[in-house]
Amino acid sequence: LLWGKLGMSICYDLRFPNLYRKLTKKGAQFFSIPAAFTFTTGKAHWHSLIRTRAIENGCFVFAPAQCGVHDNGRRTYGHSMIVNPWGKILVEANINKKQIISTTINIDEIEYCRNKIPSMTKF
């Protein structure tokens, strides 16, 4: 990226915080985490996990997510979102329809949040 370093993972990786800590220590400022959480696990964990990874690493998170009922009957949660390093959801997709989301981000928020919560210097 011309404007920063992107750390990439997928779906179930979201449950392993050490992966994101390693990506951050290697310079990641943004995470891309495409996922297909089931409706049940998504409803229970999706928002919390995405926001937590953003907060604990001081990174923006781009989280595209499958939504709807698929040919095999599997129902995925959706809720694609972009979260800032403070854990604020900047934009979120509607659960009931496929759509493209976008927002303007301020990359200065990365340094600001990392200075406010200097967890990267502790471990």
What are these regions (language model features)?
Residues L1-W3, P85-G87, N106-D108:
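Short loop segments at secondary-structure junctions
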Residues L1-W3, Y12, N18-K26, I110-F123:
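Cysteine/selenocysteine-centered motifs that mediate thiol-based redox chemistry or coordinate metal-sulfur cofactors
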Residues K5, R15-I100:
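CN hydrolase (nitrilase-like) catalytic-core segments centered on the catalytic cysteine
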Residues S9:
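Internal catalytic-core helix/loop-beta-alpha segment
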Residues K97-N115:
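A short, polar/charged loop-to-alpha-helix boundary motif
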